[in-house]
Regions:
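Histidine/acidic-residue-rich, glycine-tolerant segments that coordinate divalent metal ions
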Residues: 138-142, 146, 153-259
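Histidine-rich, glycine-flanked metal-binding segment
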Residues: 18, 32-76
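Bacterial Sec-dependent N-terminal signal peptides
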Residues: 1-18
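Metal-associated gating/positioning segment near the N- to mid-region
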Residues: 73-150, 154-156, 260-263
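Active-site gating loops and adjacent loop-to-helix segments of metal-dependent hydrolytic enzymes
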Residues: 88-114, 172-188, 285-319, 333-336, ...
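His/Asp/Glu-enriched, well-ordered alpha-helical/loop segment
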Residues: 242, 320-406
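Divalent metal-dependent hydrolysis catalytic cores, especially in the metallo-beta-lactamase
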Residues: 108, 112, 119-145, 159-167, ...
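Active-site core of metal-dependent hydrolases
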Residues: 172, 217-323, 337, 342-347, ...
Length: 433
């Protein structure tokens, strides 16, 4: 009797799953970078049943699935930001010449509890803006990022899917230059200081035990001059890979990036200065580049809030350097995944700086279809979630957004996402605006 009761309940639950039929104006295929017309997406619960021509949808399907008419919009996978700091905020103000001062202030005056609440607000905003998955890379105290992810998974608050690193593994000093010797212990609240290869492997075990699903290392400690050694990074990579966990490296100089790639990391974050030889090695070893560039609007706002004059020549040189690096990487075939490094308070709506990283790629001459692939298909590969998200296809999670049809020629359409679905649940619906 209990078996039949269980079977009946299972059948009833299956029947109660919400079913949606999405009619897309255009559908962005993140694998091929093509915009397709006349397509429909059928969803049951949180899983995509099928993607097919709208004309092939059966009468039974039209009857049983709730229609979501997105025929005036472009439908695409939810955006993925591979480099976030949801629990970190740096406030800009004139005459602040002490790099790292805001991090010290955050540790002393904010603490993990406030930062977790701040992160919760940002996580909600990210999701509502169409960013359905993130990789959060440290600067979150002692595993407050893991706690935030737990709350999202338990349904306590809305937010994107999260990969979490916990404290980044760093050489002496972390990213807090000027901290006097007496107060070096403060740095350990934000970074895991690595002392040698054996300690480096132990640090990996600590983070994995606490719930980290990616390991963030600092190949160099910009703005501090200290660096991890190749042997220390190799020890980290070997230990992380034993547990099936990826390692991605903060590396702002070519030397730091090259050393990290030699050590076997899976990703390079920032990579502002990359020689062709380093890019070639990245292609050979399949290392992903996450360029955390800002667009011209963000750069202008940064200078304004910092009390600096806007120098057109300086801005042009800065943007040209970023353009050169990403263009060379793209032409060589380096796998590029989108990431923002969004932690500065630009006095913009939460999540807008993340979108502006994508706009920066456009300003550097990358075609829009490639940019959308960076933020979906490639980003999912970088997070090792490419069998469940990043593409709209059968069996994948229903993480779907819709933007204006102008997206093919207007990258700014990403700033105004009109529809968001995560896990088969409608989060944002602004179709009538």
């Amino acid at each position: 009797m209990s078996f039949f009761l269980f079977a009946s309940l299972t059948s009833l639950i299956a029947q109660q799953k919400q079913q949606y039929l999405i009619k897309a104006g255009k559908l962005f295929d993140s694998e091929t970078k093509e915009f397709k017309t006349g397509m429909a997406i059928l969803i049951t619960g949180n899983i995509i049943d099928t993607v097919k021509a709208e004309k092939d949808v059966t009468a039974s399907e039209r009857k049983n699935y709730t229609l979501l008419d997105l025929s005036k919009f472009t439908v695409m996978p939810g955006l993925i930001d591979c480099h976030t700091h949801l629990l970190c905020k740096e406030t800009l103000y004139p005459d602040n010449k002490v790099t790292g001062l805001e991090m010290s202030r955050s540790l002393v005056f904010d603490g993990d509890a406030y930062r977790a609440l701040y992160g919760a607000a940002r996580a909600k905003a990210y999701l509502e803006a169409g960013i359905t998955a993130v990789q959060d890379l440290g600067n979150s105290g002692q595993f407050a990022d893991v706690a935030l992810n737990r709350a999202i998974l338990e349904g306590l608050l809305p937010g994107p899917r999260m990969r979490c690193s916990g404290p980044g593994l760093s050489s002496y000093g972390g990213q807090m230059p000027g901290t006097i010797f007496k107060h070096q212990e403060l740095i350990k609240d934000e970074y895991r200081i690595v002392k040698n290869p054996l300690d480096a492997a132990d640090a990996v075990r600590e983070n994995v035990t606490q719930g980290a699903t990616v390991i963030k290392i600092f190949a160099n400690n910009t703005p501090n001059p200290t660096m991890l050694t190749v042997d220390e990074m190799k020890a980290i990579v070997d230990e992380a890979h034993r547990y099936g966990v990826r390692v991605t490296a903060h590396a702002t100089s070519d030397k730091a990036a090259y050393n990290a790639v030699v050590a076997g990391v899976d990703g390079i974050e920032h990579g502002y200065q990359l020689a062709d030889s380093t890019l070639d090695l990245m292609v050979k070893k399949g290392v992903v580049l996450v360029p955390t560039d800002g667009d011209s609007v963000s750069l202008s706002q940064y200078l304004k809030l910092s009390g600096e004059s806007i120098n057109p020549s300086m801005m042009k040189n800065y943007m040209s350097a970023l353009k050169d690096r990403i263009q060379r990487a793209h032409k060589k075939g380096v796998i590029i995944a989108a990431g923002s490094d969004d932690y500065i308070d630009f006095k913009q709506p939460f999540a807008e700086p993340s979108k502006r990283a994508l706009i920066s790629y456009y300003e550097s001459g990358i075609p829009i279809p490639a940019i959308l692939q960076f933020a979906t298909y490639n980003a999912a590969k970088q997070l090792r979630w490419n069998r469940r998200i990043g593409t709209i296809k059968k069996g994948f999670f229903a993480d779907i957004i819709a933007v204006d049809n102008s997206i093919e020629t207007n990258i700014n359409a990403l700033l105004h996402v009109r529809f968001v679905m995560k896990d088969g649940k409608v989060i944002t619906n602004k179709l009538e605006l």
